[in-house]
Amino acid sequence: TVLQHLVAAKLCLIMPENSFEIHGASVADGPTDRNGDFVINNTIIHCTTMPGALLIEKCKTNLRNGTHPVIITIFDRVHTALNLAEDAGLAGRVEVWDVQQFLSANVYEHSLFDESKRNSTLSDIISRYNNIVLDTETDPSLRIEFDAK
């Protein structure tokens, strides 16, 4: 849940408004006719802390449909996702990104690598994240408190 909404908050910074849909983390892809957590042009983004066989099957379907799957996961699971993709014959066809690098690269880019602007950029991402939580989830305790200094 947190992972998916942090990714959504980051995407909101760089994508035009309403260019992709944001769903509650408990909303399954199947019933909503989605190919992944985020569909942006021909890229399908999957957010998970536990990559598994079902996710790799979704990636296969993405590729068959002419779209490009990207898995965003936690650092400890990057190699798991890469190994699963390789075992399924998808090596080099599925991107796998560590969420911390995905987010921190954005913070550095949007702050123009100026340390004095980093907290402001991070605060913007967290504010967007908190709004997403309030709009899509029933548990407000998922919000993040951040005091930009």
Where are these regions (language model features)?
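Catalytic core segments in nucleotide and nucleic-acid processing enzymes
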Residues: 2-149
